[in-house]
Amino acid sequence: MIKRSVQLLILGMIGLASSVLNSAGNTDELSDFEHSFNTIQESSTPEEPFQPLKAGDYDQAYDYYIQGYYLKAFREALRRAEKNDPFAQTLLARIYMEGCAVPVDGARAALWFERAAKQGEPQAQLRYGLMLFDGNFVKQNQELGEQFIRKSVNAGVKEAYFYYGQLLLYKASQEKQTLPGVSSQSRENEAIEQALKWHLKGAALGDAEAAFAAAKILSLGTLNRPKDERNARKLLEVAAQNNHLKAQLHLAQWLIQGRGGEKDFDRAFHLLLHNATHMVAPAQISLARLYRDGIGTKGDTIMAAAWYLLAKEAKMQAPDLEIMLQGMDNTQREKAQKEAIKLLPVF
């Protein structure tokens, strides 16, 4: 009996051990099963090191920016800028300058432009160089500013050609004031020639400011180059097509006068009308004269007066149009005032 009890005890212990082993196996399986439902998994591989963008890479922050999602653009740019991405630093500086999503802060913009510029980002080099040259938000250092601007020119930034040309003209004018004489006049003439060269390069890349600046130099001529109104008009066309306001106003006058090419009253009228409807007072004055004289449109004194009244609201006056107003009777003036109200933009 005792022998049988011992055998049962041994068998029971063996069964318990087997049960424990099976239970342990089941526990491991259960643990694996539960782990498979855990949505927060432990990372199997370490996080990849941050890689700044290269030229041509897709830029999520800039994509947000051009779509108008400025806060998202700011956050994404800040995340990358803090990790020393020069493209993100440049965009962040731009956002601070424009006040998109955050208050305008020129000092912070200068800080980020500086960081990006020192890493060789061409757009930042231009903007930081201009800040240094003018002393805006940073201590003025024209020599260092010129170096950064020249670097952006060498990198092919199209806007940089205009600024570098203007920089040369500025330096020559300053030298003329401090050291008047034949030598300074000679250097000024040389600076104009050099500025024209840089402006023409910028114009060839489609920069409106460079095209307009080159047009002005060509319309006057230089010491070594006679005035060239035909090519000046072509450059005005380039600038005007790129929405350069002054170029559009100048081109309209040239089209009326026939400078640099044939007269085109109809085109001049529509150029001025486009800007006048956007409340550009000089365009309103010029358009008033076209209505008064019947150039490019049917003569209409009432409409001429209406456009001039709008220009007067912007504190601009023209003696010849004042005489026109004085020659109108009360009925005509009332009609002109009503037409002027109709011309106001609706927001």
Show which residues each predicted segment covers:
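N-terminal leader/linker segments that initiate helical-solenoid repeat arrays
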Residues: 20-83, 87-90
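Terminal, low-structured helical/coil segments at or just beyond the last alpha-helical repeat
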Residues: 31-37, 46, 312-347
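Short helix-capping/linker turns of helical repeat alpha-solenoids
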Residues: 50-53, 57, 68-69, 82-86, ...
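Hydrophobic face of amphipathic alpha-helices that form TPR/SEL1-like repeat modules
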Residues: 57-63, 91-98, 127-134, 165-176, ...
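Structural signature of tandem alpha-helical TPR/SEL1-like repeats
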Residues: 67-72, 103-112, 139-148, 174-198, ...
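TPR/TPR-like (Sel1-like) alpha-helical repeat modules
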Residues: 150, 298-316, 341-345
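Eukaryotic tandem repeat interaction scaffolds
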Residues: 196, 203-282
